[in-house]
Swiss-Prot record:
Compartments, record wording: Membrane
Protein name (Swiss-Prot/TrEMBL): Taste receptor type 2 member 103
UniProt GO cellular component terms: membrane
Cytoplasmic side, ranges: 28-61, 114-132, 207-229, 286-312
GO molecular function, one term: bitter taste receptor activity
PANTHER family linked to this entry: TASTE RECEPTOR TYPE 2, TASTE RECEPTOR TYPE 2 MEMBER 103
Encoding gene (name): Tas2r103
Glycan attachment residues as annotated in the record: 166
Organism from which the protein derives: Mus musculus (Mouse)
Amino acid sequence: MVLTIRAILWVTLITIISLEFIIGILGNVFIALVNIIDWVKRGKISAVDKTYMALAISRTAFLLSLITGFLVSLLDPALLGMRTMVRLLTISWMVTNHFSVWFATCLSIFYFLKIANFSNSIFLVLKWEAKKVVSVTLVVSVIILIMNIIVINKFTDRLQVNTLQNCSTSNTLKDYGLFLFISTGFTLTPFAVSLTMFLLLIFSLWRHLKNMCHSATGSRDVSTVAHIKGLQTVVTFLLLYTAFVMSLLSESLNINIQHTNLLSHFLRSIGVAFPTGHSCVLILGNSKLRQASLSVILWLRYKYKHIENWGP
């Protein structure tokens, strides 16, 4: 009976993870295609749309790297003992995750600089040079990426030494847990940046509402609505990102447990929810993407009815 319940839970988690992968890939490919088509039609593209497109592409690559690692661990776990395979999987995961997180952070910076209202001269300069601010942010992220790659190389070398010396599986898993813990540490930097943008947006909204109370203006003006929409997008990103970081930390702390157990699959399902859920939020929160998604849904409904009419 216990075995049956365990099997049902295992299949349920695998199904959830599979659906998350499918929805995540379709959602991010959709975001990228909409922006590419719009770019081709107009002959130009805004910096924000470029960030959306880059984020969607990096998220798609990240999900594909997760699928690859998941299939390798499921179908042939022995490959994880090979230095080349470990290096390939870890670096591909780390690079795609790095850019997907940093591009999302750049979106938070764009929202903050576009929506927030401060009279500070430094803020006004940053607001005017928003593109340069994002460019500098990406350059800094590349420096952090290089540092992360150095750590990854040391990790794979150590793992190879353990394999050659026939070290126990627990030692290998401890090294992998250390890798996850360190990688999580590197992802905390963009999280701190996004959290700062969120807090500054709240402060900007509070000041704006305070000024409106003094001037006896209505509470739902354009600036207030923009603040609220920006906060909704950023806070959703932070919540999903927090769940993602916690899943990585939990997996690194529970790494001595067999990696195919229910807890591991549950943590992976939480991790995959980050790139999947955030892409859905971006589609719903962006007017162009939302309109394009409605057009696709209407087209699919029309095709479905057309097929039904031709049926027997």
